[in-house]
């Protein structure tokens, strides 16, 4: 898969406002400041397609991007930012839950975690929620350039334990040096491939 075209479509407070239905969707989820915007920019080879912010919790809306005129990348609000009041957290939680329950086009979720830290309670909750909903996902361990190659495997162990995945199922990612980009593009190609119709009996 090659990303030849990428454009920002809309921001929305509720998924019900989205008019771009009909195309498959890939959602990007993760806590605030885990590098979602940077991943989207690197994936699309565009420096400022998704606005990156030094202020965690900036993405308070669901942002939709159209890639290759053939699928949508849905950037979900970052969760788990301490400075946000309880009401706002509840609103975010409902916004995301509504999206997962209402989107018929969702094919896969990219769950971003920082490779340098153990997954938070919010990461575990998201993981459990996706499993209960039966939504396929892949864990993306971001900021891999911040640690040595040798340390990566060691850092993956607590992530695997917390999120019940195997090391080979995780994509180590760096928006700085492009680590994991080819792997992620291959995953998207597989996920977006039209489902083969079962042969008639």
Whereabouts are the PLM-identified features?
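Conserved G1/Walker A P-loop phosphate-binding module
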Residues: 1-83, 200
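Canonical P-loop GTPase G-domain recognition
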Residues: 3-15, 146-201
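Residue-level signal for inorganic ion chemistry
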Residues: 65, 142, 184
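Flexible beta-alpha connector loops of hexameric P-loop NTPases
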Residues: 79-89, 145-148
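Hydrophobic packing within well-folded, soluble alpha/beta domains
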Residues: 39, 109-110, 184
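Conserved amphipathic alpha-helical interaction elements at protein-protein interfaces in regulatory
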Residues: 45-49, 102, 132, 190, ...
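Helical mechanochemical/support elements of P-loop NTPase systems and associated helical scaffolds
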Residues: 22, 48, 61, 72, ...
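Conserved C-terminal guanine-recognition region of P-loop GTPase G domains, centered on the G4
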Residues: 94-168
């Amino acid at each position: 898969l090659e990303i030849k075209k990428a454009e920002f479509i809309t921001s929305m407070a509720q998924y019900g406002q989205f008019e771009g239905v009909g195309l498959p969707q890939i959602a990007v989820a993760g806590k605030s400041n885990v590098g979602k915007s940077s991943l989207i920019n690197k994936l699309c080879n565009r420096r400022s397609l998704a606005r990156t912010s030094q202020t965690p919790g900036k993405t308070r809306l669901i942002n939709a991007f159209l890639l290759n005129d053939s699928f949508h990348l849905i950037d979900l609000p970052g969760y788990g930012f301490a400075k946000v009041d309880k009401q706002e957290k509840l609103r975010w939680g409902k916004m995301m839950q509504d999206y997962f329950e209402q989107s018929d086009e969702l094919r896969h979720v990219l769950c971003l975690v920082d490779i340098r830290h153990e997954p938070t309670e919010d990461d575990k909750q998201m993981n459990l929620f996706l499993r209960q909903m039966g939504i396929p996902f892949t864990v993306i361990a971001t900021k891999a350039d911040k640690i040595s190659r040798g340390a990566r495997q060691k850092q993956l162990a607590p992530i695997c334990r917390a999120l019940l995945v195997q090391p080979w199922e995780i994509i180590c990612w760096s928006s700085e040096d492009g680590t994991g980009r080819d792997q992620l593009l291959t995953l998207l190609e597989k996920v977006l491939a039209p489902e083969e119709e079962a042969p008639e009996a």
